[in-house]
Amino acid sequence: MMRSLNRCSKHRAAWLLLALTTFSLELVALYFQHVMLLKPCVLCVYQRCALYGVVAAGLVGAIAPATPLRFSGLAIWLYSAWEGLQLAMKHTDIQLHPSPFVTCDFFVSFPAWLPLDKWLPSVFSASGDCAVRQWHFLSLEMPQWMIVIFGAYLAVAVLILLAQFFPPRKRDLFSR
């Protein structure tokens, strides 16, 4: 299994599939925001940024998947999935255990050199409250689904990382 994962990580289609699935989740988030009129909170916006990090990882890996450049994509993937998982767990904790002492920020804070909330306010502006439960599906709230999603992305990234230590076998059909 690890050898086949190693072989798969060296193909462009796998990296593009990663970028496509994550970008699809971004489109779903924009649907929730602009069509269903759910208000994203600060942690929701940060989780979106983590998803965009996974999209970027897929695109970096797709540039040259058979070269060591894929390790850069893998590092971005691991970091983004880990940060997204941490944010989703924090968001879930705020929703499940509301407290006046534990809240999220009122405004997103991006670096001065990358003010995404000013450049694309329709995507990166936060107007909701982190403690408000706005949507659920199959008895899980939105941040709980994000735990599942980021956990799956992280688990697959770790498996791909471990698979790099198992070189694929060369198929020699004519030697005996």
From Swiss-Prot:
Gene Ontology BP annotations: protein folding
Major localization class: membrane
Periplasmic-facing ranges: 32-49, 90-144
Gene Ontology terms for molecular function: electron transfer activity; protein-disulfide reductase activity
HAMAP family: DsbB (MF_00286)
Role this protein plays: Required for disulfide bond formation in some periplasmic proteins. Acts by oxidizing the DsbA protein.
Name of the protein in its database record: Disulfide bond formation protein B
The species this protein was found in: Sodalis glossinidius (strain morsitans)
